[in-house]
Amino acid sequence: MSETTKSQTTEIEAATFRRLLDHLDKNKDVQNIDLMILANFCRNCISKWYASEAQQRGVDIDYEQARNVVYGMPYDKWKDQYQKPASVEQLTAMEKRKK
C-alpha cells in the first residue's frame, strides 16, 4: 500500500462515506431495524454521528439537518414512503440484541 497524505486520506474517507449513503439510498428496502439487529447501527445512528462530528468541528448542524443528509430528504418523508411496520420477529430480535 502506498503512502497517502492526510488530505488524500480525508478525500478517500469522504468518498467512501458518500458511497455508503448512496448504497443505503439504493437499498431503501433494508429497514433500519434490520440494520440495528444485524450491525447495531442504522441510518439514524449515522445521522447522530454526522451531527456530533460537525459540532465537534464548530459546524452548526443539528440532528434533523444530519438526517436530511443521510436520508437524502426530510426524515418524515422518508419514513412515510419507505419505512414498513416492524414485524413481531424484528421486534423480538431487537429486544434480544439489547440484552
Where are these regions (language model features)?
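Domain-level signature for proteins that mediate thiol-based redox and metal-cofactor handling
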Residues: 2-99
